[in-house]
Design a protein with these regions (language model features):
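ABC ATPase "signature
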Residues: 217-218, 226
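Short helical segment in ABC ATPase nucleotide-binding domains corresponding to the A-loop/adjacent helical element
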Residues: 93-101, 111, 115
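Catalytic Walker B motif of ABC-type/P-loop ATPase nucleotide-binding domains
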Residues: 157-160
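Conserved ABC ATPase "signature" region
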Residues: 108-127, 180
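Helix-to-loop junction immediately C-terminal to a conserved catalytic motif
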Residues: 48
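Conserved signature/switch motifs of ABC ATPase nucleotide-binding domains
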Residues: 134, 152
């Protein structure tokens, strides 16, 4: 379980987050949605301590994030970004092996898991394992990025606008794939997007952000049927009902 308690982040005169309170249950697929600059990416960067709050605390399984060993915390967290961060001079298999090698897996364990996961995302290792990132399409590169994030069997998967640069077909395929893998591996997934359709499709619950504050946290159907504010209603194309 991940819990934000009265979390704030302030840069000089700008409040990036203000008094954020949010509880994310183990195994939940939580989507953070809102316009650019609303604080979505800041929230997930705080989980693996790329950013530190100026006020409040974030807890993982009842323990403050800042009390975890930083290296162990990051090795237990998968991260998938919009900018596909594969090392260009390493093959697909070598890119995927980086985290397992840090965890001292054997070569046999790495090879077996790499083959298994690449098959799940439709990239057979015999055909794709030896390729460089430059030899892959954008959608294929992001599939490799997902495998690399998942191979270490993280408890938490952070996904920051991972599909926004892809074509519509690749995006739809990867949305389905991500949800399937989330369920199969039982991870807690925190997914950032500005796309409300994507949020509705993927989320167990949605947290709607505006100007560094959470306006509503609810299941997709509740967001649509009972938006808490005019902002939430407008964002999702509806209206507030009394």
């Amino acid at each position: 379980m991940i819990e934000y308690k009265n979390v704030a982040l302030r840069y000089t005169e700008k409040d990036v987050l203000r008094d954020v309170n949010l509880r994310i249950e183990n195994g939940e697929f939580m989507v953070l949605v809102g316009p650019s600059g609303s604080g979505k990416t800041t929230m997930i960067k705080m989980i693996n301590r790329l950013l530190e709050p100026t006020d409040g605390n974030i807890y993982m399984d009842g323990k403050r994030i800042k009390d975890y060993n930083e290296r162990e915390l990051r090795l237990s967290t998968g991260y998938v970004l919009q900018a596909i961060a594969l090392f260009p001079n390493l093959t697909v298999a070598e890119n995927i092996a980086l985290i397992p090698e840090m965890k001292d897996w054997t070569k046999e364990e790495i090879a077996q898991k790499t083959e298994e996961l690449l098959a799940k995302v439709g990239l057979p290792v015999a055909e794709y394992g030896h390729r460089l990132p430059s030899e892959l399409s954008g959608g294929e590169q992001q599939r490799v990025g997902i495998v690399r994030a998942m191979i270490g069997q993280p408890k938490i998967l952070l996904m920051d606008e991972p599909f926004s640069a892809l074509d519509a077909i690749s995006r739809k395929q990867l949305q389905v794939l991500t949800k399937e893998l989330h369920k199969e591996f039982g991870m807690t997934t925190i997914f950032v997007t500005h796309d409300t359709d994507e949020a509705l499709k993927l989320a167990d619950r949605i947290a709607v952000l505006q100007d560094g504050e959470i306006r509503q946290v609810a299941e997709p159907e509740t967001i649509l049927q009972a938006p808490a504010t005019e902002f939430v209603a407008n964002l999702f194309g509806g209206s507030v009902h009394d």
